[in-house]
């Protein structure tokens, strides 16, 4: 079998990175593309696939935001006309092997774009724990917590269904049970690696259909601005987002008709019930869920704050406004059950940096709400 290998994929792949891979594909003319690696390799592989099959495709058109992936203004090019795409993950977290998403960074602007279209769904995914056995502890931890955030956000999404709920809950049960084992003895514990591989893929199937939320919007930009691993960025922000979304009287709700009243606290409480975390009221159950997530992070060596990762305070504050605006504009924000104001995103970033908890501030004025809504409509 004639083959060639492109192995220069960066941890946060850039558009230039994908273009280089597409050039190699154009020279070789493959009829099968195999993306073997973690989320970066699979995401970059998807973009290479697009540029190989459709070199005329415009990146900014593909990155255009939309309200519903099935009813978008831009028609994504039809994939599979030249090559069959196979994804083989070597880490348990991203779920990219079963999702219609690819995250890529514009190297010129530094903006990280989550591209989304069902044409990006791989033709085949091969889940084999043998490829995971040598993953180092840091990667195992970051990837595992990333999968937690996928399952939690999919369950809280305004587009969640019975199908995505089952996948998300079962993924979480297995992650809480097997991630510490995979972290501590991953080179020898085949069962833990296999269960984590399956859990990450199930979480991927959940958010492939229910989508994500503002935790990922913020994590995309935190990672792009300060070069934190994606899973770590999600881990640092997830508690803040759970508290933010749990408000019974949000400043602004999500935008889909099926989400007709605030009930995200009850949804998080259902996760706590499934994991048998205890609690008599929804408030207690949410606190127990947050506690369990924090204990899991401690077990796998995730630090508590953004500051703990050596991010300079002045640099963080200097870039906070730009990071906040880009997070607000991120594609993932639209499926969040509570539509955030930019001031609220900024506060969550600050809390995650200093290790504080999100609390409701004074209700914004009508003028502030109108300004945020106007900006949201303009960007959409």
What residues fall within each predicted segment?
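Gly/Pro-rich interdomain helix-loop hinge
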Residues: 225, 232-315, 358-359, 363-368
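Short, amphipathic C-terminal "tail helix"
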Residues: 315-380
């Amino acid at each position: 079998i004639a083959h060639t290998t492109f192995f220069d994929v960066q941890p946060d792949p850039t558009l230039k990175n994908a273009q280089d891979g597409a050039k190699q594909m154009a020279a070789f003319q493959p009829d099968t593309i195999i993306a073997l690696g973690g989320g970066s390799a699979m995401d970059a592989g998807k973009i290479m696939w697009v540029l190989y099959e459709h070199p005329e495709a415009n990146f900014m058109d593909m990155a255009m935001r939309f309200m519903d992936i099935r009813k978008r203004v831009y028609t994504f090019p039809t994939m599979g006309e030249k090559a069959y795409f196979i994804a083989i993950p070597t880490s348990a977290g991203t779920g990219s092997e079963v999702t219609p998403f690819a995250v890529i960074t514009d190297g010129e602007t530094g903006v990280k774009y989550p591209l989304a279209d069902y044409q990006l769904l791989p033709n085949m995914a091969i889940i084999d724990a043998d490829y995971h056995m040598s993953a180092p502890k840091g990667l195992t931890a970051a990837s595992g917590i990333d999968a937690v955030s996928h399952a939690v956000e999919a369950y809280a999404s305004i587009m969640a269904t019975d199908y995505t709920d089952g996948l998300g809950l079962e993924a979480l049960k297995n992650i809480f049970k097997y991630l510490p084992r995979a972290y501590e003895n991953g080179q020898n514990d085949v069962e833990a690696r296999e269960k984590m591989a399956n859990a990450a893929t199930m979480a991927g199937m959940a958010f492939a259909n229910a989508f994500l939320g503002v935790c990922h919007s913020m994590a995309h930009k935190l990672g792009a601005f300060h070069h934190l691993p994606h899973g770590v960025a999600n881990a640092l922000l997830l508690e803040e987002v759970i508290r933010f979304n749990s408000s019974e009287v949000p400043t602004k709700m999500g935008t889909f008709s099926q989400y007709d009243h605030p009930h995200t606290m009850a949804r998080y409480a259902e996760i706590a019930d499934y994991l048998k975390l205890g609690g008599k009221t929804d408030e207690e159950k949410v606190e127990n869920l947050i506690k369990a997530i924090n204990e899991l992070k401690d077990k796998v060596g995730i630090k508590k704050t953004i500051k703990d990762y050596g991010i300079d305070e002045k640099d963080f504050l200097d870039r906070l406004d730009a990071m906040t605006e880009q997070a607000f504009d991120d594609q993932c924000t639209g499926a969040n059950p509570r539509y955030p104001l930019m001031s609220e995103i900024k506060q969550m970033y600050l809390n995650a940096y200093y290790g504080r908890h999100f609390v409701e501030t004074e209700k914004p004025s009508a003028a502030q709400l109108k300004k945020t809504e106007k900006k949201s409509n303009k960007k959409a």
